[in-house]
Each structure stands twice: as C-alpha cells, then as structure tokens.
Amino acid sequence: VANAKSGHPGAPMGLAPLAHLLWSRVMTADPKDSRWINRDRFVLSNGHACTLLYIMLHLMGYKLSMDDLKAFRQLDSLTPGHPEANHTDGVEVTTGPLGQGFANAVGLAMAQANAAAAFNRDGFELFNNRTYVFLGDGCMQEGVASEAASMAGHLGLKNLIAFYDDNHITIDGDTNCAFTEDVGKRFESYNWNVLTVKNGDEDLSALWDAIVKAQQEKERPTLVCVQTTIGFGSLNQGKASVHGAPLKEDDIAQLKTKFGFNPEEKFVVPHDVRDAYKSYADRGAAKHAEWLKLFEEYGKKYSKEYEEINRRIAQKLPEGWEKALPTYCLLYT
C-alpha cells in the first residue's frame, strides 16, 4: 500500500491472524490447479482489503509473484485495487461493492450443496467443500447482504462460514455514528449459528475453537463475529485514519520492528515462512490427488454422473440446451 501510495491497510492488518489460520490450518485448495472443483472457496466481500488476499495467494504459491505484489494498484497489473475474478489466479469472485461479495458467497455455498446432493453416493463423498467469507461493517450495512443472509438461513447452508470483521470503524469513523444494531441478533433471526471471538488480534485458540464449532454445525450457516482492531500494530490502530490511506514511514518502521522484521527491508518473506506455506500448499495438492483417485473409482460405478461432472468441469453446455429456451409468439408481422 505504501509502495503504491494508495490503498487500504487497516482491514488487512486486523484480519491477518485469521487469514493465516484459515490458509494454514483450515481451507483445502491446490494452488497448482486453482480450478479444482472440490476446493474450498474464499470470498473477500470487503474487497478493498485485497492486499491481504494477494499476500496469502502469493505465499500459497498461486500465480502471483513478488513483482506482482510490487505492482499493486498499477494499470494492467495482476493486483488491482479490488479483486477481479478470471484475472488474478485464486480469486473466486470480483468484489468491491460492499455486501455483494457476501451474496456471491451464498451463491457459491448453494452450488456446493447442490453438487453434493446431486452427485454424492455412499462411499463417494465427492463434494464436501465449504465457502468461507470475510465481511466488514460496510458490508453489514448493505441490503444485498441482508437479503442473501436471509436466503442462506432459510436454506440451512451449513457449508457457509462467514467472518464478520467487527472493528467498529468505517471510512466515516466510528460505527456509532450510523450503525448501532446488534448484528449477531439479526443473524440469529435469519436462522444462523452465531459465535463471537472477543480478541481476534491475538487469540488464535479462540479463533480455532470458533472455526471447529462452525464446521460441526449441521443445520445452519455460521457467522463468527470477530472483534478486531483495524490497523493492528500501527500507531493509528483503532482509528478511521488507518482505514484507507498508506501508513507513514515512521509507522511502518516501528511496525516492522515490533513484529520482528528488519525495518530497512521491503518485500521480504522469511525462508521459514515460505517453507511453512509450501507445506500447506503441498497438503492441498495431496488431498486433490486423493480426490482424483476417488473420482475415477466413482466413474466406474456411476458412469452417467461421472460424465455429467466432467461436462461441468469442462464448462460445456448440455446437449440440446437450446430446446429449453422459451419461445414467444409474434404479436405483429
């Protein structure tokens, strides 16, 4: 963000501990084949926080280099100011308009549940993936998020886990100026399982416990209200000023020192961190390989369903699709 002289550092800093936990311990994906159909999906509804997503994709080994990170917010780069699907490897949906990404996540979870219902068989759990989504106060204020949340609760999308970045700050300042509702109570009324983590900045154990409980939920989607500090570690942490403007040089220097980095170095990833994330990516690749073997065995027993899944993977229209199009009579000649 500082290098680009533009961007939003606050939310990425507040959500970094949760992001690390999700990618290192929770989500299953294969960066070498980012379109694997049974991968977990991640949606960043508060798309302005995309530096966090780009960093995680880079660490995991997606097609996003350090030079791409340096080109953040530059014309034609792979790291635009908001995530763009079919442009940046690993980005599931284009987000930016607040709340829209959350609705996209509900749609993804619906598709996952549909695939599981249509194709899973005894001994062949082909589709067991989940959708994870980050959203902030701005997303929570949008009608599109409310409508989608109501639908998700109605459908009982147990495979949907949302993390609400509850930092009480928007670009306008403290949320008390315009947004004082009890979000958790609202989601409970939508038939969501609602959990709270009081220290999302440092309490990884509480975050982990909440994720485990969310995964164990069998009837409802889950909202985890994660109380974070926007710009955690900055001299301006907790303030609206850290939401959408680069940190000053002295702030960046003290931040690096505080977290054990050389304040003189830029765009550096320690070797042990790279090794750790490679192991997380390798774990996902191994699960993908296991899935492919299961899928081949599935094909021997359920050939029709196997062919249908492959058609969908290839993104081909079903034979005779045009016959299902509606026809209209001419009212004039």
Predicted feature residues:
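Short, mixed-charge aromatic SLiMs
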Residues: 37-50, 74-83, 127-135
